[in-house]
Amino acid sequence: MGMRMMFTVFLLVVLATTVVSTPSDRASDGRNAAVHERQKSLVPSVITTCCGYDPGTMCPPCRCTNSCG
């Protein structure tokens, strides 16, 4: 088998594995929809409740006692 033939076989194998391993948009949208819905509910709780989680955050102490005004 010559070098050109081996290179052609290599390219065909790479192309075949790329086509097989790439998911279609239709199949991946159903799985990602549940993750995106769950993320929306998690983000505000992380942003609004900073007291007690990390002492290095830039949260003013009055937010912990709800006395900011």
From Swiss-Prot:
The modification Pyrrolidone carboxylic acid is found at Q39. Negative results: does not show activity on Kv1 channels from several sources expressed in Xenopus oocytes (Drosophila Shaker B c6-46, Xenopus XKv1.1 and XKv1.3, and Loligo SqKv1.1). Glycans are attached at S45. It holds the Pfam family Toxin_8. Contains 3 disulfide bonds. O-linked glycan consists of Hex3-HexNAc2 pentasaccharide. The keyword Signal applies. This is Conotoxin SIVA.
